[in-house]
Amino acid sequence: MGGGGGEQQQLEVLHALDVAKTQWYHFTAIVVAGMGFFTDAYDLFCISLVTKLLGRIYYRVDGSPSPGTLPPHVSASVNGVAFVGTLSGQLFFGWLGDKLGRKRVYGITLMLMVLCSLASALSFGHTPTSVMATLCFFRFWLGFGIGGDYPLSATIMSEYANKKTRGAFIAAVFAMQGFGIITGGLVAILVSASFRAAFPAPPYGEDPVASTPPQADFVWRIILMLGALPAALTYYWRTKMPETARYTALVANNAKQAAADMSKVLQVVEMRNIGNNGGSRRPFGLFSGEFVRRHGLHLVGTSATWLLLDIAFYSQNLFQKDIFSAVGWIPKAATMSALEELFRIARAQTLIALCGTVPGYWFTVALIDVVGRFKIQAVGFFMMTLFMLTLALPYHHWTAPGKNHVGFLLLYGLTFFFANFGPNSTTFIVPAEIFPARLRATCHGISAASGKLGAIVGSFGFLYLAQSPDRSKTEHGYPPGIGVRNSLFLLAACNLLGLLFTFLVPESKGKSLEEMSGDAEAQEEAPPPLQTVL
């Protein structure tokens, strides 16, 4: 069949997707696709909670006035190795998803997450170093699976959705992170409270050895292990998802199979006389001049905004300790037992997430197809810049003992809110909408990997930068830095740069994927609309 007929058949299939009414399968796909992000957020949230417990269990120093803590290089490895794995997985599975198809590799990422979550909890060794080494090994591969879920889930959801509610559906997949955060916090609270009641222990200051009961070693393992359950429960449905019609029609060049796959899960009228396509019309590659001309600046925009956003977003834990100590939520470590400390940290961070982090996700879901991606991202970057400057300029006013705690807490929560009702959501959504189908997962993976590089810089680069310039006031094992206040000024600058790079990213609200990517550029007239079955 000739190329023109093939393009017409492609467009009939794609137009049917664009005008399909919202159906039950869309919501099923959100849950199935979102489980990877649930696991991602659960793991990232919980590992930050249990690191202090790991320090008490494995790095106690006899005679020390304060509990054991993970050495800086060990803490960086335990927390950061999953980021490195995620970055690698985003690039690898993004490329593989375009090469082999979304469906063929989608189950692999979830199985990696399930198995490595369980294996992380079973980390073993005769010495603290060997336990941490095995934990880091499994956390790398956990991150690798999580990384693969970024481009695949975003691409699959964008290619299943209609153009009217596509943004909300992709945002809802990403918003599963909110459920992961809250679930992680609740699990940590319940497990630590249960063990605390079953195995009472004195504060560290009273009895350093007895303050960490032997059973505490089970606590962090149970918390990490339970994160695998929701993902495992959705594995069957993930393997049953058909290949997306857009991949089959535009990349595999089989419009007939695309129509058949679509009819299995979405109720649309059977299309007329559709056969196989004659071939792909514009087979330019990622490194071609044509791609650079048409999408080069778009890729720079999506990658740079995600990079800058994650530098700022993941660095916000720098001043959590100031908030928690200032408002009295977490007393000094020596006045608590190991399980009491875990309970209090989990409770405080869960409350922050519940009030500041999670609502922003769902504001994005509700408004992204009304307001548009560009406005939400630009306003989010602007507000984050404003709030960080407001925190930085009178920083000593906010952190002075005995006052100003409510204002500091409010600004901190609003910064998280406008990150999630802003660029943290839109940087995930837009790369799945604006690139050609045959490069969509690859470009999303590149953008996401740029973001994860920013997360590494934000989490660890600024952890060193934010140390006090006075060596006597730095945390144990860290060299002097530029201080939290100056770090906040740098982060405000990152947000401002993110706002500027946002202007390189096109608005995709209400437009078809083919219109945004140019996949159907040669076809000036769309086929007559196909009516969906009610």
Swiss-Prot record:
Activity across pH: Optimum pH is 6.0.
Keywords: Membrane, Phosphate transport, Symport, Transmembrane, Transmembrane helix, Transport
Residue ranges crossing the lipid bilayer per the database entry: 30-50, 76-96, 105-125, 128-148, 169-189, 217-237, 295-315, 351-371, 376-396, 406-426, 446-466, 487-507
Induction (record text): In roots and leaves by phosphate starvation. Down-regulated in roots when colonized by the mycorrhizal fungus G.intraradices. Down-regulated by high phosphate in suspension cell culture.
Molecular function per GO: phosphate transmembrane transporter activity; symporter activity
Keyword Transport: yes
Pfam families reported in the protein's UniProt record: Sugar_tr (PF00083)
Subcellular location: Membrane
Side of membrane Cytoplasmic, spans: 1-29, 97-104, 149-168, 238-294, 372-375, 427-445, 508-534
Membrane side Extracellular: residue ranges: 51-75, 126-127, 190-216, 316-350, 397-405, 467-486
Mode of membrane association: Multi-pass membrane protein
Similarity comment: Belongs to the major facilitator superfamily. Phosphate:H(+) symporter (TC 2.A.1.9) family.
Known function: High-affinity transporter for external inorganic phosphate (Pi). Probably involved in Pi uptake, translocation and internal transport throughout the plant.
Further remark: Although related to the sugar transporter family, it does not transport sugars.
PANTHER family per record: SOLUTE CARRIER FAMILY 22 MEMBER
Protein name: Inorganic phosphate transporter 1-6
Species lineage: Eukaryota, Viridiplantae, Streptophyta, Embryophyta, Tracheophyta
